[in-house]
Each structure stands twice: as structure tokens, then as C-alpha cells.
């Protein structure tokens, strides 16, 4: 065991040679390096695989009951202060290491083909390797200073990855938005770290927890100050994990390449905030009110993320809001003190969401063979449909990932989400009702995404788009105005400004380009990689893009089994419970580790029924009528309800506009913060230029004229001296006369 632990130092730095060598090679041998650029994927995968092997070995040691803290080096500032750099390997670290390495390897393999035609291929792999380095360093940190250093590096990597295609203005704006939003959280994190150092005098987790618990027990610390410092630490996690109200950067982060989205949402950036709260949970549990704040932010984020996902047309943005909502479940579990359930859902959600994002990348890849490189079209679910005939493997993988996220047994997310919902009933019935309702919303919008993408016909190629008036069917959404809809070449898209009462599909139209393959700046040439044949229809991705999907399907099927309590009789296969021993659980303090299968099945039936209800509603509303005309009469009977629908239309229209406009939160920030700061900046600039500079320049000008006057008088001319003498005498004489 000691032989294994002495090599743990290589974990955070094993990948460091990759970005360094890529940079050096591009400087000294640019042409040769670019000619063999795909060779650089191999060392990235190889080194990360080595780290993965170490991670699994360490995890086995953790399951067997070991914990390790390895001291590395110490930097002594003076006799009273020294800073220690170290590695902390415990159950939380080993879980995060496995998540980062397994998902990271699959994303790198996937990216080799996905980015093969991009001019920034080498830069992409350098950024990805550096991002993995930062995250590995973060989860192995033994103190708050190391956490903050790698925390900032994770933020820098996210800035570089989100803005990878920086020549696109929307991508450049997205990375700036993510960076600025996270600056708010990072500032709070730094203040919180300094506050707890002022209280305890230590950055090390072991000493920090021990000293702080003693101070709380002896009532030797100011409660308000402690709550403030803990809240500031939590603000850092709120920003990094896209929790309300600092979630606004997450949907815009989808402007980066899809493999980046998979990595950020599954194993790196958004997981960093969850990791921070989990790492500091022994600190938070003894602070009044802070756990309530964490759970409150979690439940708000759950509901907000689910409602904002309802109207998304972009497939990646829909998955982004799904991530936001699912991270809310994890934050809720941490706030309730259900440590095991939180980490369980972190594991299952990571693999399911990686599967969905890589699946969406395969979908986008296939759509680009028709519409060219145009994210507004290749990622638009309204322009998809019927893809199950063209990408059957991707369809199956995406379908299983969708079922998992919906909480359908026996897939992974069912076990973890159900555990969180069951614990929420013990914590707060109101929170439990919201969590259960959101589970139904999750099933609704995820199946909406699936149906719009794979069912029906490929909308871009429908004959009805030729302009012929051949269709008089009603809108496929029941929430539009009464009347027939003729489908023309101008495709009906959702709009923000909807004054006519239309809902999910407005009659305001936006013409599609006649030649969608002409691109001003093509990043990717859409051809089949083997025979250079251009496709006029979607096609399945290559094998090295499908292989990670199949592996993630296996994870989605079986990773949930690590948390299923099989401890019946002589069986003791609850791996996660042994992995997390000792575990924090404020809701089951008197538990004897027994498991009531009857209670579990009863609660599961309720949650699964809600999920199936959401799936049914989604299927009823979004299953295309072009492929299921037998339901057309029923649909038209709802559409023709006449005046009874007016109030319902208004309600749905308000909900739709609220969801489509992201709850008006971005608009509020734009008005209340951005414009206010701009006005304050302009006033400050005016005050600086006119008042501060005016005083300084006024003194200079006055001195200049006084000096010029003195210089003129003292020019050596007798007449000037005589004039000054007589003028002075006259002044004194007048003053004397007045007095």
C-alpha cells in the first residue's frame, strides 16, 4: 500500500508534459508538428490512462478502509507562518479521480475524430490536458490555498475552452461572461478562505476542522462572522456549479466544441463547486443556518433549471439547463446532510450527462453534413427529426441516457435521484414536493428533446418546405392559436416577442438560407473521412466517436449498482457505503445500516410514476403528427375548443415567454448591473476628467500665468520696476486712507 501511495504525486502533474511539448513543438517545428498533429492525441490518452490506473488502485485501498495524507513540502515564511503543499487522498478524492479520468479519456478519444478537421486541433488537446491537470490538482489538494490556486486554473481553462472558437463573436462573449460571472464567486471564495484563516490560523483541512469544531463547542467565535465566511465560501461553489443566481454563464458556455461541453458538465468545472461543498461539509454542518442556505439554493436551482429547459431549441442548451437542475439535486442533498446520496448522484449524473453530450455531438456532426457549419441550424432541434433512421447507434445511446436522466429503472440516475427524493421527505415536505414535481418536468423536457431530434421526419428535407401548399394540418403543438397552418419554406421558429398569443410555435417566420453550405469562415469541412464523399443526408459517426458512447452506455447501465444496498443476509455488496465510510448523514443519525426494500419500492413507484407521466405528456405533445396521423382527430378536438382556450393560451404564453427569456434574469442583470455599472463608470470618468483633472490642471494653468506675470515684471526693464513701485505705493496709500 505504501508502495502505491509514494507515487501519488504524479496524479495531478502526469499530463503536464502534453501541453508543454505541444507549445514547444509549435514554436520550433510548426510545420512538422501540424503535419502529424493527430499523433498528439495518443500521449494525452496514455498519460491520463496511467492516472486512471492509479486512481482505481487508490479507490480499492479506500474501500478496504485506508486513508492517506501525504506531506510533500513546506514553505516557511517566518517562525509563525509556514505553508504546506500536500496531497489528501480520501474517499471523496478517489471518487473524483475516477470520474475525471474515465470521462476525460473517453472525451479525448471522441475528440480525436470530432476535432480532426479543425485548425485548432493541437490547441484543443493542449487546453483539454491542462484542464484535466487543473481538476486533478484541485481534488487532491490538502488545504484551502491549494484549492484556490487550482480553482483559478480551472476557471482559466474554462475561459479558454468555452472561447475556443474565439473568432465567432458569440463564443468570445460567452467565455467572457463565464469568466466574469465566476470572478464574483472567486472573490467570495477568497474572502471566505481569509476569514477562516483569521478564525483558526490554519489552511490545512485537518487542522481547520479540528480547531473550528473546538471553537464552536466552546462558543469562542462570533456566529454572525462565521456564517458570513461560510456563505462567502459557498458563493464560490454557487458560481462554479452554476447554481442560482450565478447560473447565467452555463447556457452560453455551449458555444464551445461539444466535447468541451461534455467534459465541463460531467467531470470538471461544474463538478468543482460540488466538490468544494462536499470537502467543506464537516465545516458547514456545525455552522447555524448555512446548511439551510445550501439546501434552499439547491431546490431553487432544481426548479429553475427544469423550467428554463422547457422551451430550448438548441439541443446543447437544453442539456445545459438539465445539468443545472441535476446539480441542484446534488446541492440539495448536501444541504440536507445526505452526503452519500449527493456523491452517488454526482457519479451517476456524470456518466449519463457525458453520454448525452457526446450523443448530441454525434447528432450535430451528422446534421453538419446537410446544413454545414452553422450552430444555429446544426444544433436546432426544430430542424431535426427522423434521425433514428440515419444514426441508429447514436439514437440508442441517447435514448438510454435520456431514460437514465428521467429516473427510469434500472438505469443509473434512478437509484441516486430516488435516494435524494426519499431523503427530502425527511427534511422538508415542501422541498420534497418540488423535487418530485421537477422529476416529472425532467422527464418531460428530456423526452421533448429526444422526440424533436429522432422521431418523425427530417424537417429540413420535408417536401412541405418547397413552398407548395400541400399541408393544412394544425400545429404540432397544442398551445398555438386555432386554425390551420400551411408549412412553407419559411420555417416557423419560436420567438421571444409574441403579441398574438401564440405559444411554443409562433407564426413569425425566419427564412432559411438557400445555400446552407456556403460558409464565410468554415471551421470544419463536412465530408466522410474515408472517401471524401459529401453527404446529402445525415450519417452515423465514425467508430472512434461511437466507441465512447458504447462505453458510457455500459456505465449508465451498471454504475448505479455500486450504490444499491444488497446487504441482505450474507451479501454485503453496497460498495458506495463502504467507500464513503465514515459518511455524514444528518437525516439518518440513528440508522443501523439496514435497508427497508418495501419502503424503497413504495417510494420508487411514486417517483417513477411521475417520470412516466412527464414522458406521456411529452409524447402526446411532441410526437410528430406526420408519423402518427391516427391521433390527429383528437388533437384537432383540443385545438377547436374555441373561446375556452383564450385564457389557457395566455397562461401558457406567459410561461413560455418567461422560460424562453431565461426567467428574465439575464435581462435583470443587464439592466440592474451592467447598465448601472456603465452609468457609474461614466460618472466616475466625468468626475475624474472634469473635477480631479480640472483641479490639477487649474493649479498648473494658474501657476503658469502667475509665472508669466512675474517673468514679465522681472524682465530687467527700469520702466517696469518703476511701474510696479508706484502701483504698490498707490495700493498701500488707498488702504491707509480707507482705514
Curated annotation (Swiss-Prot):
The membrane-topology field of this record reads: Multi-pass membrane protein
As one GO molecular function, the record gives: NADH dehydrogenase (ubiquinone) activity
Query: Which is a GO BP term held by this UniProt record?
Result: electron transport coupled proton transport
Q: How does it assemble?
A: NDH is composed of at least 16 different subunits, 5 of which are encoded in the nucleus.
**Any idea which UniProt keywords this protein has?**
Chloroplast, Membrane, NAD, NADP, Plastid, Plastoquinone, Quinone, Thylakoid, Translocase, Transmembrane, Transmembrane helix, Transport
Q: Which domain of life is it from?
A: Eukaryota
Q: Which reaction does it catalyse?
A: a plastoquinone + NADH + (n+1) H(+)(in) = a plastoquinol + NAD(+) + n H(+)(out); a plastoquinone + NADPH + (n+1) H(+)(in) = a plastoquinol + NADP(+) + n H(+)(out)
Q: Which lineage is the organism of this entry classified under, starting from the top rank?
A: Eukaryota, Viridiplantae, Streptophyta, Embryophyta, Tracheophyta
Q: Where in the cell is it found?
A: Plastid, Chloroplast thylakoid membrane
Q: Which InterPro entries match?
A: NADH_UbQ_OxRdtase_chlpt_su5_C (IPR002128), NADHpl_OxRdtase_5_subgr (IPR018393), ND/Mrp_TM (IPR001750), NU5C-like (IPR003945), Proton_antipo_N (IPR001516)
Q: Which GO terms describe its cellular component?
A: chloroplast thylakoid membrane
Q: Give the enzyme's main class according to its UniProt record, as a single word.
A: translocase
Q: Indicate what this protein is called per its UniProt record.
A: NAD(P)H-quinone oxidoreductase subunit 5, chloroplastic
Record Gene3D superfamilies: 1.20.5.2700
Extract the NCBIfam families matched here: NDH_I_L, PRK06590.1
Bilayer-crossing residues are 9-29, 40-60, 89-109, 125-145, 147-167, 185-205, 224-244, 258-278, 283-303, 327-347, 354-374, 396-416, 425-445, 546-566, 605-625, 718-738
Instruction: State the function annotated in the UniProt record.
Output: NDH shuttles electrons from NAD(P)H:plastoquinone, via FMN and iron-sulfur (Fe-S) centers, to quinones in the photosynthetic chain and possibly in a chloroplast respiratory chain. The immediate electron acceptor for the enzyme in this species is believed to be plastoquinone. Couples the redox reaction to proton translocation, and thus conserves the redox energy in a proton gradient.
Family the UniProt entry places it in? Belongs to the complex I subunit 5 family.
E.C. no = 7.1.1.-
